């Protein structure tokens, strides 16, 4: 496994995965995964479905417990006690495949609810923050629409705004475009690119290779729960060293 020059090498690691193992019964979902995410970096996790990418993401904020190794957040091991784990989750925004919006709340209230219920922010201040975030993702005009009145791409942009409302240190994206119609994928990727340009630390599980190639600072290739290769996108997409990486990208028709 070759490591190319890392643009963010001088930055402190925000998340470190150290020989992480995760088992589901006898099935090994993660098999000795060692990677790190530096501050201000976009790290994309790619590879075939079922290779452990989403599992690693869920281990980052203790939605899943690990069976070996360590996950360090700002140098501190991820807590196993649920109350402390919740505090860690508050520092991370997570965007899921299927939006996970409250269907009975409009877009504005979906974004405002976290700061009110978790951070104890006043409703007025939370709604003011929520409106600014909806403006940021291009949906101020849809603030009073319910999820049923929004397209998939619009719902996912609301979900991104909701995650940002908690002012996270890290944003985790679990295949954020996989449930979208092709014509709405671009609007979500554009919001994510804007966050990257602003210096948000991001870990992204994605099948959007063009996004990974153009936006990521570091790309990690998974197969059968293992990291088969990691490096800058120029290495992964133009000069991969692992045969499995070449096979995977070739299967997708990626030609650099």
Each PLM stretch: what is its role?
Residues 1-9:
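Pre-NBD coupling/linker segments of ABC/ABC-like ATPases
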Residues 3, 234-256:
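C-terminal boundary and immediately downstream tail of ABC-type ATPase nucleotide-binding domains
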Residues 10-233:
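ABC family nucleotide-binding domain
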């Amino acid at each position: 496994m070759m490591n190319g020059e890392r643009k963010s090498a001088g930055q402190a690691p925000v998340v470190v995965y150290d020989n992480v193992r995760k088992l589901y019964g006898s099935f090994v979902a993660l098999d000795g995964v060692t990677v790190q995410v530096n501050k201000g970096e976009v790290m994309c996790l790619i590879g075939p479905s079922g290779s452990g990418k989403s599992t690693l993401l869920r281990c980052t904020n203790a939605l899943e417990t690990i069976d070996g190794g360590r996950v360090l957040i700002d140098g501190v091991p991820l807590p196993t006690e649920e109350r402390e784990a919740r505090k860690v989750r508050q520092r991370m925004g997570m965007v899921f495949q299927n939006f996970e919006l409250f269907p009975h709340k409009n877009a504005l209230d979906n974004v405002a609810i976290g700061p009110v219920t978790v951070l104890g922010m006043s409703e007025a201040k939370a709604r003011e923050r929520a409106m600014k975030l909806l403006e940021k993702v291009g949906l101020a005009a849809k603030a009073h629409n319910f999820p049923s009145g929004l397209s998939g791409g619009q719902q996912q942009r609301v979900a991104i705004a909701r995650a940002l409302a908690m002012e996270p240190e890290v944003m985790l994206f679990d295949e954020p475009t996989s449930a979208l119609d092709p014509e709405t994928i671009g609007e979500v990727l554009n919001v994510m690119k804007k966050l990257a340009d602003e210096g948000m630390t991001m870990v992204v599980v994605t099948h959007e290779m063009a996004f990974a190639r153009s936006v990521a600072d570091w790309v990690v290739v998974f197969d059968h729960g293992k990291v088969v290769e990691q490096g800058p996108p120029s290495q992964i997409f133009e000069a991969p060293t692992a045969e499995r990486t070449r096979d995977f990208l070739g299967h997708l028709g990626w030609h650099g």
